[in-house]
UniProtKB/Swiss-Prot annotation:
InterPro entries linked to this entry: Gas-vesicle_GvpA-like (IPR000638), Gas_vesicle_GvpA (IPR047870), GvpA (IPR050530), GvpA-like_CS (IPR018493)
GO molecular function: structural molecule activity
Function: Gas vesicles are hollow, gas filled proteinaceous nanostructures found in some microorganisms. During planktonic growth they allow positioning of the organism at a favorable depth for light or nutrient acquisition. GvpA forms the protein shell.
Subcellular location: Gas vesicle shell
Record gene name: gvpA
Organism: Koribacter versatilis (strain Ellin345)
The protein, known as: Gas vesicle protein A
Pfam families listed in its UniProt record: Gas_vesicle
UniProt family annotation: Belongs to the gas vesicle GvpA family.
Amino acid sequence: MAVERVSGGSSLIDVLDRVLDKGIVIDAWVRISLVGIDLITVEARVVVASIDTYLKYADAVGLTGLVSRPQLTEVVEEPVVVEAPATRRTARPSRRRI
């Protein structure tokens, strides 16, 4: 007698895709004490999400205010001409944002 598997479940790739798309947060707080004296206290918050999902929800709750985010503008470099009394030379290009 052969055993048949039902393929109605989710594969690992489907689960990972959903977790990265929606994101999950694991919030843990553990305290170990002996006779009323705290020996170890552990507080942890683990966020599992894609970068886009994290930034979208972190902006909504104001968590990205402390982090410097790079500007997503195009940088155009133009040469700067520096004129000296006796010679003329080209300095390093400066960076100008559009």
